[in-house]
Amino acid sequence: MPPVLPKYLAGVINTPWKGVVILQVVIQKIPENLQEFEILAVKGRQPEHICALLLCALSLFDKNMTDGVNAMNLLRGPKPMTPYDAQFLRDRLRGKAYLPLAYFEGATPENGYQPRVPYRLNVLADPRPQDMEPGYLLVFLKTAGADSPRPMKLRQKASTGEWFLWEYSSILSGIRIPAAEDPWA
């Protein structure tokens, strides 16, 4: 039996994986600054693009906190970052510049989480979308650094139909450290 697709996926070409729909986003370059991020962000507000943009914003945050906060605010919409949110990101990313890249295809602990270029992100749709309240969407991101895909929740702004970040703390949870940094490897 084919998986039940969220309404926004109707008509989208996708690839099934173990009964779960996978949407792939391809990025040629990870933004180096806010201006590059904004150009990339114009390409779409679809949920799978928001997932890829989150990883780009986290990478940017690690390089330049101000640009990273501004990028995150673009993704969070009407719920901007608080100082607590910025501190949470700083704590989770400290010493882990590899973390945002770990979700792209080809990134493994063995290669220091250096993904192949172009950057490909596979977004797994919720296998049980009927359990999600209207206006919200649960998706999952897979990394070679964890045993199971990590969830993130998006929220749709009813007046515009745009999707925004809502809950993404699992994406920032610890993963296996790169093999080069692992004294037990």
Per-range role (PLM):
Residues 2-3:
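Intrinsically disordered, low-complexity, charge-dense segments enriched in Lys/Arg
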Residues 12, 16-105:
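Core segments of small alpha/beta cavity-forming domains
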Residues 142, 147-184:
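Short beta-strand edge/turn micro-motifs at domain boundaries
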